Amino acid sequence: MKERLTITLDKDILQSLDATIDGVTIRNRSHAIERLLDMALMHSNPRKAVLLAGGPFVSFHGKQIPKPMVPINGRPIIDYVVRELKRNKITDIIIVSSETGMISEYFANENRLGVKISYVVEDTRKGTEGALYIAKGLLGRDPFFVMNSDCIFKINLEDVYKQHVATNAVATMVLVTQEVTHKFGLTKVTGLKVTSFVEKPKVENTDVKLINAGIYLFNPAILSKIRLGTKPVMFETDLFPKMAEEGILYSYVFSGLWAKLDMWNLENSVTRLSKVASEGLKNGG
């Protein structure tokens, strides 16, 4: 139940307030004030993230290792993700994997990074959606990030959160531009809404270049939409296409540092990411 409130504002503040009204996500002054108060009273950024670290092992230099443990300049690629979360003040991290031994051994002294890491073990491969499903008991009532563990990136996650709140989204997907798109989840966007999502399209699309970066911000309401199956259930082929069709999947387009491990050409990809990490993360990460 809402109550009427009368307030007096300076003219300059009122002009700034009116500038946020777009008639769609912010309908009027009352709505603008309510939304800004919501943003001010909530945490500046979610403090929890789920890292999806499952999938089959990969062969690297004669050894079978989990993909998140592939070394980039002497550090597992998942280490870059954890450090980027810490840089964004996200310190409660849940890692979901079918094999956590090597990962947990590496992060045995996570206190040195200033984070708390919990582990959820898949008894069988669950897929990206299934992995979140088995971790939902650790998520609480606040928004949370979910991301892949095979990318190097540098992003202001607070900006993602601010847009997520402003659009009243249940799910926000970070998008990046790529020239070659057939290896990724390809999106079409109208305004901020994702209107179409196709995972790894068979035919290269020369018109659409926005792809899924594997970084998501979810409200707890998403947990009622995900499912666990007898076979792996994927965000990319199950949840996201449905949400795009329903018009409830939002996007955040990102133009900063982002590079993904390419399993089709692993050795060259490691070389490329080593260069990206050396040149792009000079000031931390």
Where are these regions (language model features)?
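Catalytic-core segments of class I nucleotidyltransferases/pyrophosphorylases
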Residues: 22, 26-31, 145, 152, ...
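Conserved N-terminal catalytic core of the sugar/cofactor nucleotidyltransferase
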Residues: 2-6, 11-51, 56-59, 63-64, ...
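Acceptor/aglycone-binding surface of glycosyltransferases and processive sugar-polymer synthases
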Residues: 184-195
